[in-house]
């Protein structure tokens, strides 16, 4: 990629199936660069294409990226996940999947007097291990990218100091200095109040701020990270998405953290293990509660000391993604029997044989997708719903996208069902949160999409998770 204010040397390679020449049937009349997105980049020709007696030639140009160059990004945007639709940033591209890339090379021929133009986006070439040479369209990105590890989370009410780490990346080919600071809610302070960075070309650095919330209540707060360099402010970062064979594109995120003050109690001495499945950010969310789980490897499942953990969480669809999990199911059940807590997040049908007592999803897996539905608490005084936080129907308010999937259809009498919810026209679903005492420990199955709610800082999801991992305390 390139950044505003930089130069790029572009080689345009032109070839044809036959020779061209002045006055011949096939003539190459000109080669040039253009900006399909409507920008104007100053271009200097360094080496002209040959128009005589050949069927292949190169033209070389220097393209200067203006300071106000349009960044390569989607022409549509959505300010937050609460908004159900996208807004059009640039109506010129409304009938296209993406806005055009910023620079293209063109050649014009005449064949028997008929003009023919051919063009291609300008591409950069690099090598990837295992793939080899890969060509990607040239893109324009900001000089500095500002990123946060997460964009939403909780701050337990009563917290006096809370860390927030900001990563600043220099995407230019020159060393840059930058000053980083946070825009905080009124009355909040941080230390340091700013951070000075010396960034190498392509380099990145972290700054961790100790944030001191004042008057923290059960509401949303917004914190923005800003990096200043060369008299300009930068307050967003981007991810490059795509893979070999699919043109990459660039998705931007504002460097904004949405913090939610939450009344939550979490035992301070919990030790938690996590078995990652197909991928989620639950371990990071647990960190916001002061719990820093250990990611368990296949070797840990086979021979590790599981008894050191107060609770072990099984990630979403882990029984499908981790063969070692099913192979060592008895070790996990032994861990529960000896006093541990095993929390199984939503799975597919294959996990049923790994439970201590019979349970199943049934022939048709039940999902509950209307997050506006009401969740009924069936056993409000059950310890799992009272310790250390009292869970009520209000903890299921404000959920995003869905309540959950893979609700159980059948379960043994050893299990207790704690909640009920259903979509309109659907039979009541009580298989979303069930648990059983097994030996000295507790086995829990939860199909509620906690992993999705934790990402969005939904207070009730954190409070419920705190109760689940505390079940053995």
Q: Which stretches of residues belong to each language-model region?
A:
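Short, hydrophobic beta-strand segments
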Residues: 57-101, 205-216, 221
